[in-house]
Amino acid sequence: MPAYFQRPENALKRANEFLEVGKKQPALDVLYDVMKSKKHRTWQKIHEPIMLKYLELCVDLRKSHLAKEGLYQYKNICQQVNIKSLEDVVRAYLKLAEEKTEAAKEESQQMVLDIEDLDNIQTPESVLLSAVSGEDTQDRTDRLLLTPWVKFLWESYRQCLDLLRNNSRVERLYHDIAQQAFKFCLQYTRKAEFRKLCDNLRMHLSQIQRHHNQSTAINLNNPESQSMHLETRLVQLDSAISMELWQEAFKAVEDIHGLFSLSKKPPKPQLMANYYNKVSTVFWKSGNALFHASTLHRLYHLSREMRKNLTQDEMQRMSTRVLLATLSIPITPERTDIARLLDMDGIIVEKQRRLATLLGLQAPPTRIGLINDMVRFNVLQYVVPEVKDLYNWLEVEFNPLKLCERVTKVLNWVREQPEKEPELQQYVPQLQNNTILRLLQQVAQIYQSIEFSRLTSLVPFVDAFQLERAIVDAARHCDLQVRIDHTSRTLSFGSDLNYATREDAPIGPHLQSMPSEQIRNQLTAMSSVLAKALEVIKPAHILQEKEEQHQLAVTAYIKNSRKEHQRILARRQTIEERKERLESLNIQREKEELEQREAELQKVRKAEEERLRQEAKEREKERILQEHEQIKKKTVRERLEQIKKTELGAKAFKDIDIEDLEELDPDFIMAKQVEQLEKEKKELQERLKNQEKKIDYFERAKRLEEIPLIKSAYEEQRVKDMDLWEQQEEERITTMQLEREKALEHKNRMSRMLEDRDLFVMRLKAARQSVYEEKLKQFEERLAEERHNRLEERKRQRKEERKITYYREKEEEEQRRAEEQMLKEREERERAERAKREEELREYQERVKKLEEVERKKRQRELEIEERERRREEERRLGEDPLSRKDSRWGDRDSEGTWRKGPEADSEWRRGPPEKEWRRETRDDERPHRRDEDRLRRLGGDDEERESSLRPDDDRIPRRGLDDDRGPRRGPDEDRFSRRGTDDDRPSWRNADDDRPPRRIGDDDRGSWRHTDDDRPPRRGLDDDRPPRRGLDDERGSWRTAEEDRGPRRGMDDDRGPRRGGADDERSSWRNADDDRGPRRGMDDDRGPRRGLDDDRGPWRNAAEDRISRRGADDDRGPWRNMDDDRVPRRGDDARPGPWRPFVKPGGWREKEKAREESWGPPRESRPPEEREWDRDKEKDRDNQDREENDKDLERDRDRERDGDREDRFRRPRDEGGWRRGPAEESSSWRDSSRRDDRDRDDRRRDRDDRRDLRDLRDRRDLRDDRDRRGPPLRSEREEASSWRRTDDRKDDRTEERDPPRRVPPPTLSRERERERDREGEKEKASWRAEKDRESLRRTKNETDEDGWTTVRR
């Protein structure tokens, strides 16, 4: 829509303006823009006149497509608002089209009969015919006037029907337009358009049935809709009958019957009567007299039943028509010889069944059936007397000589009733044919031969030719046995005795049978005669006996009938079951066969599809290649043709054919083309230069010649312009003078009216002054009142605003005070928390100082122990005889002032097997180094010494040097289970009071590898206090159990320590440098050996190789944990600084598992201050208890050493040929060896305690130095120091477990510094022994039961 039409009214006004000046097309365009506009889609009252004007213009201009589009747009606009407006517009549109068509028809003389299809007016034949024959002015006028308007009217009807279809709101309008369209077709005899209209209506009906779910869909179950559709179809049927379009009429009948079937209620009797009347006409016109008569029968019965006011004349007329229609049904069957030869019986039967369905009959009617119905319902009594006897003459009586004469009277009476009974005239020919046939049948039964002239005299209403044709048809179709002899002009009947009549032969009045029938039925007649004779011959008593026998049989049957009936039923049931079983088997077999066939077919289909796909691919490839080749050749050919069209190309390729050049390279041709283009370009430039010179010279000469001409023309034009200006100036002055004179005249004339005007104005003012003053006074009063009201309103509003402002300020003040109070409380809480953190820091520093003091004292004691161990090792090395060395050591030990005597303390249960010398030396020598390594591993190391260990010039203590005088790393008597052999007689490592169940294999009663006094949870990595990775009770058993609940191996955020034992493992490994996972087997892995029980884990290299390749030559550190380290495993930090642990762990393994489960709680920051305070108190109590237990353990250790020295003198020296060689003489299991001798465990336990003491000494010394360098810990370390767990782990364990482990090696010590520490340790140990002698000794005793469990008795 144009931008200047903001309202539809403006568009309508604009269109009317165009129409006033005779411009219909612009007016139509303006209104079209309005209808297409999306801005005005809501219906308004102005839309209807706009639409009417729009349709009027479309009719005037014959723009049917624009009218259709406008109607659809208007339907969308007003369908939901005002559907009545749409109906009015459509009716007005059709009325305009009809008026225009009628006007054109009056002006034209043409009847539009010669045009078959309005959609295709000019056919090639009509154009040629008009060119050949020529047309006058009237014909051309008719073609230009009437035909286009008729076509426009037809298109209008069709468009409106399409617009209104399947819309329940305009259903009445739809049927009215359809009926108008039928009248149009009938008026203008438009047969083609009638067929199209019927097809459209049929399509609309199918769409109604298909799209019944739409909101505006038509419900065919509605009686009103059904009546409207039936009415329209009856009009269609009537129009088809009037136009003699019987095929369309029959389709209309089928449509009407379909509508009847959709209806749940029976249609109205008037409608059915009209329907039967129309259908009877259709059947008669189609030549189907049988169904025509049947339809009249239905109409007759309907009228008798439903019509209450049926008169006697109407009843008589209907009965007469029914009688004549029934008797007019051909006696001969409808099937022809061609139908018999083509075996079209099925088609005929199906057709008759369909026709019977249209009449509501269950089966197709027959002539005999209709005659019987007519007699049964007593139709003959209502027939007129003149026709009443016709039934008896044709169907009952046998009188061939008078038959035609009687029938002739009836036919004459029918012919005399054209005005009263016009519909009876159509039955006369059929009645004549039936009369001739009945005459021939009766004559054949009487005469054997008859002359043709005699027969002609018996049939007076036909000539000889028609009679002969009737005779031939009767012989062909009615099984009439007749032969015509043209020589004698006679007819002979029944001459063929072998002739057999058909079953459908017509039946009529019968006198006697034909000779052929008598011969054919001779056996049947003989049988009937013999049966009668037999009845006569048989006497009565025989019949009586038969009757008695019959009664006996009946009695026996009645007696056994129930059983027999049950037997028959059972047999029937069995048969049915067997049939069902067989059917199921057959169905199953067929199903399997079908599935198998389908599977085979599927395989074949897939193979075929694959083959076709491959072939298609290959064909596609070949096609693409061919297309490429063709495109290439085409490109080459085009280039060559382009080149040859030029002069240079023609010269270059004049001797070469294009077909030969197609084999050349396109690049070569392109190069030729480029070369040729360059030459042409040069030639063109030269020609342009020459032409430029010519044009330049020519233009210069031309301009020189035209200069004087231009000057002369300028002078002439200047003179003309001057004359014109002077003339116009004179005219202007004259015009102004005339205007001034006229103005003066007007002034003089009007000046006489000035006084009258003033007087009128004065009177008017005087008259209206009082009115003005009164209105002014009223205005001032209203103004004062309004001013007062507004002032009051303003005062009230100000009061409300002040009140609202006061309450808002008061609320803001309260909110501000609450915020200040909350801020103050938060500051107080922060201040209290800050003071609490400072108090915790101070307490932590005090606790650290106490721990350092305790460590200093313990270090002095351990130095004494180390000094004593060193002296004992030197004495052991100096002595040659093992027995003398042990005696001297025992004497030295006695001289130290020990209070225990050897013989008194030496009991059988404490004595163990003689310990081998190399094992004692190994454990004593490697104890200090392992303690240092354990302590430094736990610390993780962040001082300068640990950082320096990463450098190549590593000065750490070598783990195993070449000059190491210790024994072999591992012997067959190694005390770890994973390294034991089957003959190991050592006792278990389990603590005496350890009540934990055995860990893994068999009856293994060993505890963990840790010290007996170590009650802390096990470690894995550095200070890992996590729960065990395997089962709850399995401490480092098999590498993974079935109930393993471990998480992922290692995550990015895993803060656990390295699995190889801490940060001091700098060995070259096959793992990545950042991979902190523990070794597969070794270090702290206490799992059993993967090899056999007799395998004591010898070196995987040769026995003589002592790990020199991985350890430095000066490495005197302890042995590797994975092979020959007999230290306790690092599953708990047993050598950390601090007081000694109690010897007996309260709670056992159950308490430990409970502590581990509860260790999965929240972090330490979530604990309340009361729990942290309780932790600090508990820490102090544990420190005091550790100090007491430390003194007791040292005393117990001294006791064991004295006992061991006493037993060493009786110990046999061991052959140390191979450090991995197992004992050959020991063959018992580890359980038997533990039972045989428990004393060896005491010796090994004492050695382990000594080595652990040395490690603790070095670790605490390094920890002190490390703390001095690091200073006080941060808050995160302090908070994590006191763990929220219930176990007795130390703060160092948790702190190091929280901190991510760092791969920094521990600080190393030189050999001189190590020796100084050994001497200090010996001195501290000696002083500690003197102090320990004053304390009471806790006596222990190891008892082993039958199952191998070891109990420690105090």
UniProtKB/Swiss-Prot annotation:
Give the modified residues of type Phosphoserine.
Answer: S492, S584, S895, S949, S1038, S1159, S1233, S1310, S1336
Q: Where do the sequence repeat units fall?
A: 924-931, 932-941, 942-951, 953-962, 963-972, 973-982, 983-992, 993-1002, 1003-1012, 1013-1022, 1023-1032, 1033-1042, 1043-1052, 1053-1062, 1064-1073, 1074-1083, 1084-1093, 1094-1103, 1104-1113, 1114-1123, 1124-1133, 1134-1143
Question: What is this protein's function per UniProt?
Answer: RNA-binding component of the eukaryotic translation initiation factor 3 (eIF-3) complex, which is required for several steps in the initiation of protein synthesis. The eIF-3 complex associates with the 40S ribosome and facilitates the recruitment of eIF-1, eIF-1A, eIF-2:GTP:methionyl-tRNAi and eIF-5 to form the 43S pre-initiation complex (43S PIC). The eIF-3 complex stimulates mRNA recruitment to the 43S PIC and scanning of the mRNA for AUG recognition.
What's the PTM story here?
Answer: Phosphorylated. Phosphorylation is enhanced upon serum stimulation.
Q: Tell me any Pfam family this protein matches.
A: PCI
Gene assigned in the entry: Eif3a
SMART domains linked to this entry: PINT
Taxonomy-wise, where does this protein's organism fall, top ranks first? Eukaryota, Metazoa, Chordata, Craniata, Vertebrata
Coiled coil feature spans: 82-120
Q: What is this protein called?
A: Eukaryotic translation initiation factor 3 subunit A
Q: Name one GO biological process term.
A: formation of cytoplasmic translation initiation complex
